[in-house]
């Protein structure tokens, strides 16, 4: 009995230490969040420039696999500041997604494929509806995901929604074991985002994400936020417009 209790205590201690270490890696100051968003923006521009300008550079494509997971993690952390996802913020996100769609098409993407802002908007809307525990809203959430699936071929599809949902839940989880399970899910979902493309893309996405998170967690803890609130969606639309013009 004593041995069993000792083993249980050791296991609990290991879980606690692991959880503390993971929180030091995954919980960032406002300045660190902006650093991660900046890295993600650079990776996104490299990826889009490579595709839109037909540069055909493998390293640019592989580096770009880290952009979406980084944005998703920051998004999940930002949402955790509020008890519930605010519908006003979701509406603003829908607006930016609709505005950016023209520039997405202008840059050379199929008109019927939704841009990545739609993935964030769909995920936020689905999560909000599911939180209400209303039958018709749950049905609406399922319908929205079903409709989004065929339109999300260039925006990570259902795997992208899963990545966003796990990121959202990770920063709201209060139980240590739940957080560890969610981190394990992240380590599986991040490669899954690009597994259909190639094994190299799947590995690159995970490596770029882990490397960025590891480096940023060691610096910038006292740095204040330096990007305005709507900088990302504004930059997203503008960079598509610029790349579209360059591709003419």
Curated annotation (Swiss-Prot):
Membrane topology, from the record: Multi-pass membrane protein
Transmembrane portions of the chain: 39-55, 180-196, 200-216, 232-248
Signal peptide: none
InterPro entries reported for this sequence: TraX (IPR008875), TraX_Ftype (IPR014125)
Coiled-coil intervals, chain numbering: none
Family statement: Belongs to the TraX family.
Protein name stated in the entry: Protein TraX
The organism of origin for this protein: Escherichia coli (strain K12)
């Amino acid at each position: 009995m004593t041995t069993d209790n000792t083993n249980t205590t050791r296991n609990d201690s290991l879980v606690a230490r692991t959880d503390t270490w993971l929180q030091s890696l995954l919980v960032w100051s406002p300045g660190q969040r902006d650093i991660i968003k900046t890295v993600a923006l650079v990776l996104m521009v490299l990826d889009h420039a490579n595709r839109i300008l037909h540069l055909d550079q493998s390293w640019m494509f592989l580096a770009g696999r880290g952009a979406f997971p980084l944005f998703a993690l920051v998004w999940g952390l930002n949402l955790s500041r509020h008890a519930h996802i605010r519908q006003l913020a979701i509406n603003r996100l829908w607006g930016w997604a609709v505005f950016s769609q023209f520039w997405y098409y202008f840059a050379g993407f199929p008109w019927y494929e939704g841009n990545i802002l739609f993935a964030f908007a769909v995920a936020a809307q689905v999560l909000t509806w599911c939180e209400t525990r209303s039958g018709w809203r749950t049905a609406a959430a399922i319908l929205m995901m079903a409709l989004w699936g065929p339109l999300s071929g260039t925006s990570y599809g259902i795997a992208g929604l899963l990545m966003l949902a796990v990121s959202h839940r990770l920063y709201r989880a209060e139980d240590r074991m739940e957080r560890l399970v969610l981190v394990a899910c992240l380590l599986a979902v991040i490669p899954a985002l690009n597994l259909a493309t190639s094994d190299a893309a799947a590995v690159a996405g995970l490596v770029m994400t882990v490397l960025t998170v590891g480096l940023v967690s060691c610096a910038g803890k006292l740095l204040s936020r330096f990007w305005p609130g709507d900088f990302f969606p504004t930059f997203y639309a503008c960079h598509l417009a610029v790349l579209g013009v360059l591709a003419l």
